Design a protein with these regions (language model features):
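Short, well-structured N-terminal submotif of metal-dependent ribonuclease cores
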Residues: 1-43
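Short secondary-structure boundary segments
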Residues: 13, 45, 124-126
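Conserved nucleotide-binding/hydrolysis micro-motifs of P-loop NTPases
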Residues: 16, 48-49, 127-128
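Short, flexible helix/strand-to-coil boundary loops that buttress conserved ligand/catalytic motifs
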Residues: 20-21, 55, 133
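PIN-domain endoribonuclease scaffold, especially VapC-family toxins
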Residues: 35-94
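Short, surface-exposed amphipathic charged segments that create phosphate/polyanion-binding patches used
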Residues: 56, 100, 154-156
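Active-site neighborhoods of divalent-metal-dependent phosphate/nucleic-acid chemistry enzymes
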Residues: 79-120
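Acidic, PIN/NYN-like endoribonuclease modules and their adjacent C-terminal/linker elements
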Residues: 107, 111-114, 119-120, 126-156
Length: 156
């Protein structure tokens, strides 16, 4: 008997960072679904690098033991999820795709999501990852709250 296909979640850096640094919440619940292998985390290298930079900045403001624990929690999460890695998009493609999204820094993230074709792209950045962007790219873009509301209707 084959196991059911897992929902593939492409996580933007704000969801991933929020889930790591927050003691609870939907970001952390999203990471828990991935760690439990209920969902499959799709992790773009561009997102991973941004998260690691953000975590190091966050860790600098913490007591030494807490900072060490934060970094260890992140490493453990990456091991547990066995994330599907998405390489950086080609620089020429990034330049030529600038029209797809309002903020230039989001182009590599968007292209990585398009290349990986996840079931969902989860982000809190609804100012840039708009419904128009979703229509242009054929991506299902939502906040973690929207994802969980949809999930609850499927299970209920």
């Amino acid at each position: 008997m084959t196991s059911p296909r897992r929902i593939r979640l492409f996580l933007d850096s704000n969801v991933l960072t929020g889930g790591i640094v927050s003691p609870w919440g939907l970001d952390k619940a999203t990471l828990s679904l991935c760690a439990a292998k209920v969902c499959r985390m799709v992790l773009a290298e561009v997102v991973r690098d941004e998260v690691e930079d953000n975590l190091l900045l966050h860790a600098e403001r913490l007591p030494s033991l807490d900072a060490d624990q934060l970094i260890e929690d992140y490493r453990r999460l990456i091991r547990l999820t066995n994330a599907e890695l998405v390489p950086y998009p080609d620089k020429n493609l990034v330049r030529s795709s600038r029209h797809l999204i309002r903020h230039a820094a989001d182009v590599p993230v968007l292209l990585s999501a398009m290349a990986s074709r996840p079931d969902w792209l989860l982000t809190h950045n609804t100012k840039h990852f708009t419904k128009t962007v979703a229509q242009r790219t054929k991506l299902r873009i939502a906040t973690p709250a929207e994802f969980f509301r949809t999930l609850s209707t499927l299970l209920g």
